[in-house]
């Protein structure tokens, strides 16, 4: 194995082989490092060994197979000795009694404990998992060995992970300068974007700021949508025109915010301080959008005198063209509809695992009173006249509620549908 850089880091142990860990481990292996990928899920490890991925990500299977075939990547269920350890495990949110949330560090601290027996003096630990400020230092303080620790938060978008792993800028924060420089040595092997060096607290805060900014922007759009519903304005048209201003960039409204980052990360700031009232308000507004959508749909059904309705939900994933359902607003919308006595059937062309049963398209629309679009999959955007003509005979009533503004509304109207759009009070 060739020597990499100035710090004799040749063998890397990556803990966690999910959406971030597996691509990172494979990327490093394909760039000459000896990599051991570790995951406590034995089934996942065996699937990776057999070239069977449950992660729907363009190019990932080819990358993983190349890494394994090169003999640079081995996957197993337990940690091992290495020169550097990269932790890529989930940091979900735990709900507090007051409805706020805080970071669940169970998986991160568990990963740290699992690698401690294998640590040698001079080793490096890199935390990629998103964590609250001051946690990297806390991890360093729990280890009674002379090692180096850095935080290099992941910054990739599902569906574009491999492209963004290479092209995106990265931030690396060390508990000291050498920790950051050692981590930079690893990442510059495949990162073509700029790598910014700072302290660990700043790196932690930067990642949280990035996603909090987007969450607040979406909350603003969602509040505009509610206002426009009330005063008779199409929020989508208004946002489009407002964004013509060179210093305005309002994001789109929707049924809520999901995924493993934007819907969770702002809470990691809120838990650290009482000065995050604006951040908390935005988070709560976005969390309440599923209830607003549910109320709007039920109101429309009531106008049509529909009792004991069946609703077809289009979309279970948290965003378009991915199979990831984590923190998806669809789950909350469905839960609220069910509590109101509605029969719900869900169709998603990408999702394979969801909290509620997934149906085929025909099963989903059969006898339905209303179609509610919650995810902006291309499969839904590309519904054409012939598709609508096939759908119509299977429905009981023709109502469609578009929360993402992706349908060709005129096509549906010409087919006899009542079309409702989130945030369009002009209709």
UniProtKB/Swiss-Prot annotation:
InterPro entries xref list? 6-PGluconate_DH-like_C_sf, NAD(P)-bd_dom_sf, UDP-Glc/GDP-Man, UDP-Glc/GDP-Man_DH_C, UDP-Glc/GDP-Man_DH_C_sf, UDP-Glc/GDP-Man_DH_dimer, UDP-Glc/GDP-Man_DH_N, UDP_ManNAc/GlcNAc_DH
Membrane-crossing residue ranges in chain numbering: none
According to UniProt, the reaction catalysed is: UDP-N-acetyl-alpha-D-mannosamine + 2 NAD(+) + H2O = UDP-N-acetyl-alpha-D-mannosaminouronate + 2 NADH + 3 H(+)
**What residues does NAD(+) bind to?**
19-20, 39, 44, 91, 130, 326
For binding UDP-N-acetyl-alpha-D-mannosaminouronate, which residues are annotated in this chain's numbering?
155-156, 207, 211, 214, 245, 247, 258, 318-319, 404
Q: Mind telling me which SMART domains this protein's record contains?
A: UDPG_MGDP_dh_C (SM00984)
Any one Gene Ontology MF annotation carried by this entry is:
NAD binding
Tell me the protein family, please.
Answer: Belongs to the UDP-glucose/GDP-mannose dehydrogenase family.
Biological function? Catalyzes the four-electron oxidation of UDP-N-acetyl-D-mannosamine (UDP-ManNAc), reducing NAD(+) and releasing UDP-N-acetylmannosaminuronic acid (UDP-ManNAcA).
What is the name of the protein in this document? UDP-N-acetyl-D-mannosamine dehydrogenase
Give the gene name: wecC
């Amino acid at each position: 194995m060739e020597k990499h850089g100035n710090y004799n880091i040749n063998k890397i142990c990556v803990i966690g082989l999910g959406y971030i860990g597996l691509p990172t481990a494979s990327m490093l292996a394909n760039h000459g490092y000896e990599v051991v990928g570790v995951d406590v899920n034995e089934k996942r490890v065996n699937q990776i060994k057999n070239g069977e991925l449950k992660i729907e990500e363009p190019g990932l299977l080819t990358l993983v197979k190349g890494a394994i075939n090169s003999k640079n990547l081995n996957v197993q269920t337990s940690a091992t000795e290495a020169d550097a350890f990269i932790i890529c495990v989930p940091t979900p949110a735990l709900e507090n009694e007051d409805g706020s949330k805080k970071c669940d560090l169970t998986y991160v601290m568990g990963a740290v404990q699992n690698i401690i027996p294998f640590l040698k003096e001079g080793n490096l630990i890199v935390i990629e998992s998103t964590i609250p400020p001051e946690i990297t230092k806390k991890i360093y303080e729990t280890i009674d060995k002379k090692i180096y620790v850095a935080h290099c938060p992941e910054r990739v978008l599902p569906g574009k992970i491999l492209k963004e792993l290479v092209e995106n800028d990265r931030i690396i924060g060390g508990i000291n300068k050498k920790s950051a420089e050692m981590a930079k040595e690893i990442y510059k092997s495949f990162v073509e974007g700029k790598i910014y060096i700072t302290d660990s607290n700043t790196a932690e805060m930067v990642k949280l700021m990035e996603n909090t900014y987007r969450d607040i922007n979406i909350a603003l759009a969602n509040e505009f949508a509610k206002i426009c519903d009330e005063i008779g304005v199409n929020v989508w048209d208004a946002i489009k025109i407002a964004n013509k201003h060179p210093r305005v960039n309002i994001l789109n409204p929707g049924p809520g915010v999901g995924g493993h980052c934007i819907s969770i990360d702002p809470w990691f700031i809120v838990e650290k301080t009482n000065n995050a009232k604006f951040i908390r308000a935005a988070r709560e507004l976005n969390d309440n959008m599923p209830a607003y959508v549910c109320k709007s749909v039920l109101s429309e059904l009531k106008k049509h005198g529909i009792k004991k309705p069946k609703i077809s939900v289009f979309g279970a994933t948290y965003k378009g063209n991915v199979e990831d359902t984590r923190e998806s607003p669809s789950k909350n919308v469905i839960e609220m509809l069910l509590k109101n006595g509605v029969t719900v059937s869900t169709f998603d062309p990408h999702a394979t695992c969801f909290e509620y049963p997934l149906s085929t398209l025909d099963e989903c629309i059969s006898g339905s009173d209303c179609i509610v679009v919650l995810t902006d999959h291309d499969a839904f955007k590309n519904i054409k006249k012939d598709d609508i003509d096939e759908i119509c005979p299977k429905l009981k009533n023709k109502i469609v509620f578009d929360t993402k503004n992706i349908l060709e509304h005129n096509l549906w109207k010409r087919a006899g549908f009542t079309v409702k759009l989130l945030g369009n009070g002009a209709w």
